[in-house]
């Protein structure tokens, strides 16, 4: 198995281990984060109904404008601020953070810090 495949398997193991323990509710939805090499995505998910309450990513025009590259910490900070703004518009102030198996470092940490600075608590 290649080293890339080993990393992917390890991330999926971390993801399932964490997902067993956390769930989102209407009062406190799950803030799910996914990152690829070029983009970062965030969703607020109510696990009782399986519905996405709000989402933000670097694919959206308002987040991506002014960025020369969308796969860095600056872009993750903008996505964190955008998801916090959308959550506050829907009167959601508390969330459960789901790092989706990714290490809490770099872009994931930047997104979480920006969401906290803009009004979300977790």
Swiss-Prot record:
RNA-binding among keywords: yes
An annotated GO BP: translation
GO CC term (a single one): cytosolic large ribosomal subunit
Secretion signal, residue range per the UniProt entry: none
Keywords, comma-separated and alphabetical: Ribonucleoprotein, Ribosomal protein, RNA-binding, rRNA-binding
CDD domains (alphabetical): Ribosomal_L18_L5e
Pfam (any one): Ribosomal_L18p
GO MF entries: 5S rRNA binding; structural constituent of ribosome
Classification via InterPro entries: Ribosomal_uL18_bac-type, Ribosomal_uL18_bac/euk
Keyword Heme applies: no
PANTHER family according to UniProt: 39S RIBOSOMAL PROTEIN L18, MITOCHONDRIAL, LARGE RIBOSOMAL SUBUNIT PROTEIN UL18M
Family designation: Belongs to the universal ribosomal protein uL18 family.
Subunit structure: Part of the 50S ribosomal subunit; part of the 5S rRNA/L5/L18/L25 subcomplex. Contacts the 5S and 23S rRNAs.
Protein name: Large ribosomal subunit protein uL18
